[in-house]
Amino acid sequence: MEFQYRGNKTVLSNCYQNPPLRASRPLYINPANRSEATVYLVETSGGIVEGDHNVFDIDIKEGADVCLIPQSATKIYPSYNGIWSSQDMDITIGPKASLSFKTEAVIPFEQARFNSKTVIQMTSDSTFLWGDILSPGRVARGEVFEYTDVRTNFQVWMDDECLIYDPLLISKDNMGLKKMGMLEDHLFIGSMWFVTPTIEEFDIRELNERLQESPHSKASASMLEGKAVNVRWLASDLVDLKKEMNRIWDEFANYIV
């Protein structure tokens, strides 16, 4: 997908899509920024099946503002033959452009093996807001950390220098997830990244104080080299976690405006 700023709004100037991946037409629904293009990302097959490899290539040109929203949680089906499912996202954010990627969950089913890599290339005057949740499985069916392996690698490069390198590996057979210093009694891992040119003005201490007020999760925020804010959550209820993450998301989004 390619986005450009034309005629006082951001347009989807190029979109090549191959089933089961689909992108909606741009919507202009942000009352705070009517030029921002909101696009829904749809997985028409209902999930990533064993051996599937999903690829997203997103190029946001200078001055364009984009919000991408997954239509639903990403479901990872079992890998009965031990073959990994994978997803790669390569994103470029041009000068004075912005991308907001709305929070949604990844749900690995029993015996799933999933590898995800996300690489964002941006400039020092562009803006980036990202949220994601890793679920322990289909909790309502009693699947809690029954998947085999999940690997994620999240990178952000600013002006060709690595600003964020955030790998995660959860392998239930090789980790004591309930041990102290691991997940303990929590089930869900939430993460949010916010990068914007004026981030140094953000009050990280005040944000941390408010994060501690939530009775439903453990959370903490940190400032990275005065260029990015990262917030992490551990929670046992997905609904409560989403509410808390959406609240912080809205705060960051308003800060952009």
UniProtKB/Swiss-Prot annotation:
GO terms for cellular component: cytoplasm. It is found in: Cytoplasm. Its main location: cytoplasm. Keywords: Chaperone, Cytoplasm, Nickel insertion. One of its GO terms (molecular function) is nickel cation binding. Pfam families: UreD. UreD, UreF and UreG form a complex that acts as a GTP-hydrolysis-dependent molecular chaperone, activating the urease apoprotein by helping to assemble the nickel containing metallocenter of UreC. The UreE protein probably delivers the nickel. Required for maturation of urease via the functional incorporation of the urease nickel metallocenter. Belongs to the UreD family. This is Urease accessory protein UreD. It comes from Sporosarcina pasteurii.
